[in-house]
Amino acid sequence: MKILLRVTFPHKPFNAAVKEGKAGAKLNRILEAIKPESVYFTDHNGRRSAELVVEMSDASKIPSLAEPWFLEFEADVEVRVAMTPDDLKRGGLDELGKKWA
């Protein structure tokens, strides 16, 4: 299943990593470990952030996706399940609508 991972970095730890010349190496180490399908760096509520798409086979993998960000940057991590249009079709919305209408 596809997982959307939003990582939001607090200023102080990330700034320290930048000033020490370690931010790039830390980011690369994490990205090599979790192997996202795609990653975009942006901002979220005025803070540095990253949006990643990751394939995950079961929920027990969540710690391996989140802990590196917590431990390296003291970052906030949000995990959301994402569906393709085909996933949504297989979800049976029409039947659910009939059942719960």
PLM region spans:
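Conserved, structured core segments of small domains
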Residues: M1-A101
